[in-house]
Regions:
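Beta-propeller blade termini and top-face loops
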Residues: 1-207, 211-223, 230, 237, ...
Length: 391
């Protein structure tokens, strides 16, 4: 939700309160709702996940694109988290944005896989494509190209998603009028019934053969988790969440046992399996422990995120977070202390103290301050004294 909004939701776990901008996360299996990020953001009109489960959001009016994890520490009501840094070069900041998607399709060239796409609906009227690469704890980006540009002043690209055949579908709201301030809300020129759908293909490359998802066997679905396309794997996991856990879990165990450990994507395949068990609210703790010690820090960070949300099942959650918060990679450590910020004070503070055994870079310092402030029950503006006491 955007700025100027105030939300209070009664849940089985207590009232969830939010004020001004931010994001909610709902687990339908547990009926669990949380204010996953409370940020100073006018209009959050775009959210996307990369292949490792890291989430990013478009700020719209900013018009920045940011990594969400630094801002997902638990906050005191009315206090915002740290938005962190924009990931778009200044000369390519165009507003307002709407829609965010990562390129993950064999139909598109190999060298653009992992790029992110972001739309603009007024000034630029098109879709920009940016490279995204790791940069220590966080990320950096570089503009690659303007993938779509229109001279039609009514062109309003608002969302996009890769289809099962690897093509890119783009939704054009196509409206003469746009904005809630510039024109009367009941202006007859506002079109509520028409729009356009564009399909973007790469002519020199073949389309992807769509994987069978609906009506597929559990074995077929699990094998689909090896496919390169993120959106296919996303749809497969959604389908598996609708199956009976008693039917899926034994097959997940068997599927993982047959994986080739020498395969380059082995750890990612196991991560997909872990996500399936998490989605069924029956997290496989053997897989979780395995991936917390993975060679790839992307996988370790993803495993810590799973650990964050499964404390109701993983009894040694605090001990595992205490180990992760001293990981050699900053992204894993930050996942761990962000997770700790959601725990009770007596559990959280010892974990946060361990995080000080390692340097806090510019991606980590502000989220760490906020994590300590919340766990200590003090205003973040007064946290400097508390931080000194942890040294």
């Amino acid at each position: 939700e955007g700025v100027f909004l105030h939300t209070n939701v009664e849940t089985p776990y207590g009232t969830v309160r939010a004020t001004n901008g931010g994001f909610m996360r709902y687990n339908p299996t547990r009926h669990h709702l949380e204010r996953v990020a409370q940020l100073s953001i006018p209009n959050p009109w775009g959210i996307a996940f990369d292949k490792w489960g890291q989430n990013f959001f478009a700020e719209t009016s900013g018009p920045d694109m940011r990594w969400m994890m630094p801002g997902s520490t638990k906050n005191r009501y009315g206090q915002t988290g740290h938005k962190s840094f924009t990931l778009i070069e200044e000369k390519h900041l165009v507003r307002p944005t709407s829609g965010l998607e990562f390129v993950s399709s064999r139909h598109f060239p190999d060298n653009v896989q992992g790029d992110f796409l972001i739309n603009n609906t007024i000034g630029f009227l098109g879709m920009k494509q940016h490279q995204l690469t790791d940069d220590g704890t966080g990320y950096k980006s570089k503009h690659r190209q303007d993938l779509i540009v229109s001279k039609d002043r009514n062109f309003r690209p608002v969302d996009m998603e890769f289809a099962p055949d690897g093509s890119l579908f783009l939704i054009d709201w196509h409206n003469i009028l746009i904005g809630h301030m510039q024109h009367n809300a009941r202006d007859p020129l506002r079109d509520h019934t028409h729009g356009r759908v564009y399909r973007v293909t790469y002519p020199s490359r073949p389309l992807v053969t769509p994987a069978k998802v609906y009506g597929a066997s559990i074995d077929q679905l699990l094998d689909n988790l090896k496919l390169p396309e993120y959106r296919t794997r996303y749809r497969v996991r959604r389908e598996l969440r609708g199956r009976k856990a008693a039917d899926v879990l034994p097959k997940v165990t068997a599927w993982v046992a047959k994986l080739n450990k020498d395969e380059a994507d082995y750890e990612h395949h196991v991560l997909e399996a872990l996500w399936v068990t998490w989605g069924l609210n029956k997290v496989d703790q053997k897989l979780l422990n395995q991936l917390l010690q993975a060679k790839d820090y992307h996988v370790r960070a993803a495993a810590v995120k799973v650990l964050r949300y499964t404390g109701h099942q993983v009894k040694n959650q605090a001990a595992l977070l205490a180990k992760a918060v001293e990981d050699e990679h900053g992204r894993v450590r930050m996942e761990a202390f962000v997770a700790a910020s959601w725990l009770p004070k007596e559990t959280a503070l010892p974990i946060l103290a361990l995080a000080k055994n390692h340097p806090l870079d510019t991606w980590m310092d502000k989220p760490y301050e906020i994590a300590v402030a919340h766990a200590s029950g003090v205003n973040v503006l007064k946290i400097k004294t508390q931080l000194l006491s942890l040294r």
